[in-house]
């Protein structure tokens, strides 16, 4: 009897060992994800000369909006490792901008893009745009920021030999490129330098929602060119305009002549930001920069900082 019991116990132990030694798929709470990226290059008034050099891919907890993990990928995408199993909101953007800054990056609901203020020395040169207050926020125009989003993406616990989870994400810019055309500038030979400011444009963009802020800034740019026909052209970038901004959009053209005198022309362009798919601001007026007085004219030539700057409001 005892031998029979022992024999049965031995068989039972061998059966347990056989079961324990069977190969089973391993599961893990962390799992790699393949992210495929596509950059939308069809942008009004802007030619994408090359792909971004680096993309940041952030996984946020979709319930709390809190940062969980991230990876830095080439513009075509790649693998993101060690993704804990849960539901995510995924946000991707290019990480190679010079003038566009990202803030509050640890929370999906608050992350936003903005740009930096111009130096006080530049702002002083624009002081004669007298209708603006000392606390006016004048910023550089932003670089294009390509943003992609996926919401409520569930990453399960899976066996290590299961097929990869693949996410396809398209990234589109949250920045607009606008053109400026002014006809006509006379006295171009008398211009030493020129710059421009457009007021009351969105100061930032909540990139998780592509939401323009109602807090506005003035955008500074200085890439104007005047051709032989006296046509001034320029390009500037902006986070755009929203109807939540009730202040007018005023273009200030700021010229400094070769003697150092400032000439400022203010033009209300509010109507041109509404229903304008071309994103071109056209100004059909003649602006004259007169030849500055010289000592040979028998007049007194003041120092640069003694000149009064000239303000002109142009009605179009």
Q: Where do the model's predicted regions map?
A:
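Short amphipathic, basic-aromatic surface patches that mediate peripheral association
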Residues: 30-48, 182-187
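Short, low-hydrophobicity acidic/polar segments
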Residues: 67-172
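A sequence/structural signal for flexible, mid-protein segments enriched
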Residues: 137-227
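Bacterial N-terminal signal peptides that target proteins for export
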Residues: 1-10
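Hydrophilic extracytoplasmic domains
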Residues: 244-316
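Tryptophan-paired
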Residues: 54-105, 109, 190-273
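Bacterial signal peptide processing site
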Residues: 22-25
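C-terminal motif of bacterial Sec signal peptides marking the signal peptidase cleavage site
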Residues: 17-20
């Amino acid at each position: 009897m005892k031998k029979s019991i022992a024999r049965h116990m031995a068989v039972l132990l061998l059966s347990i060992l056989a079961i324990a030694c069977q190969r089973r798929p391993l599961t893990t709470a962390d799992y790699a994800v393949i992210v495929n990226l596509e950059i939308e290059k069809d942008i009004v008034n802007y030619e994408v000369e090359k792909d971004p050099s680096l993309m940041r891919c952030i996984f946020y907890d979709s319930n709390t909006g809190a940062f969980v993990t991230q990876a830095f990928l080439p513009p075509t995408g790649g693998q993101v490792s060690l993704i804990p199993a849960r539901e995510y909101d995924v946000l991707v953007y290019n990480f190679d901008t010079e003038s566009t800054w990202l803030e509050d990056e640890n929370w999906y609901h608050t992350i936003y893009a903005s740009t930096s203020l111009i130096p006080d020395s530049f702002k002083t040169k624009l002081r004669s745009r007298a209708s603006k207050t000392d606390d006016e926020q004048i910023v550089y125009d932003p670089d294009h920021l390509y943003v992609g989003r996926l919401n409520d993406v569930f990453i399960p616990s899976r066996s290590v030999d299961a097929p990869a989870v693949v996410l396809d994400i398209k990234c589109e810019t949250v920045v607009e490129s606008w053109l400026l055309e002014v006809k006509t500038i006379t006295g171009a030979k008398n211009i030493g330098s020129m710059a421009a400011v457009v007021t009351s444009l969105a100061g930032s963009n909540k990139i998780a929602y592509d939401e323009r802020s109602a807090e506005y800034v003035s955008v500074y740019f200085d890439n104007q060119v005047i051709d032989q026909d006296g046509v001034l052209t320029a390009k500037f970038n902006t986070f755009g305009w929203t109807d939540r901004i009730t202040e007018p959009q005023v273009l200030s053209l700021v010229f400094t002549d070769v003697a150092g005198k400032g000439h400022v022309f203010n033009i209300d362009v509010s109507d041109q930001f509404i229903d304008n798919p071309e994103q071109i601001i056209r100004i059909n007026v003649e602006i004259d920069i007169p030849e500055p007085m010289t000592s040979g004219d028998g007049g007194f030539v003041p120092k640069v900082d003694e000149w009064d700057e000239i303000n002109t409001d142009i009605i179009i």
